[in-house]
């Protein structure tokens, strides 16, 4: 079993709502957690996220990392939100000591929408759950990538 915390937080940034997701204590599975309403610039958003992180670390077993969705177009070029996410990440890194990783979020909202459409017929319910579900996909991608990297390193050390 694990004797240390490997829990991670996933964030899907939006201009009106931010989706949050949490991993289990083993750092293997992501699940949607909640959506928070936000307004203001990157510093204000980072302050709201830092407050959520502090509350979470007090209530739970702590956090090992934060995976913040990094918006890019399919060809890899920046979107209209890329600079805002970079600014939020920079401000968040200044206010907390937990590593903040920018995680590629291409197609995460579409994947979340598709998954929610299979489970929930009511579009209002889907809309409520979309941001947190997108955050869970971003976080799961981060967790899977981290596991692949660990397996490669372990394979090299054999």
Q: Where would I find each of the regions flagged by the language model?
A:
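Phosphate- and other anionic-substrate recognition elements at nucleic-acid/protein interfaces
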Residues: 2-11, 15-158
């Amino acid at each position: 079993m694990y004797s240390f915390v490997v829990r991670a937080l996933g964030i899907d940034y939006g201009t009106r709502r931010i989706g949050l997701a949490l991993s289990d204590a083993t750092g293997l599975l992501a699940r949607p957690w909640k959506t928070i309403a936000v307004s203001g610039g990157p510093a204000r958003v980072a302050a709201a996220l830092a407050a959520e992180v502090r509350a979470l670390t007090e209530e739970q077993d702590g956090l090992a990392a934060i995976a913040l969705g990094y918006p890019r177009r399919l060809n890899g070029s920046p979107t209209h939100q890329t600079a805002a996410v970079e600014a939020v990440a920079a401000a968040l890194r200044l206010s907390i000591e937990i590593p903040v990783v920018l995680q590629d979020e291409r197609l995460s909202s579409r994947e979340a929408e598709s998954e929610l459409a299979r489970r929930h017929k009511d579009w209002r319910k889907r809309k409520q759950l979309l941001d947190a579900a997108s955050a869970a996909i971003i976080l799961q991608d981060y967790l899977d990538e981290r596991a692949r990297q660990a397996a490669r390193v372990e394979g090299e050390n054999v």
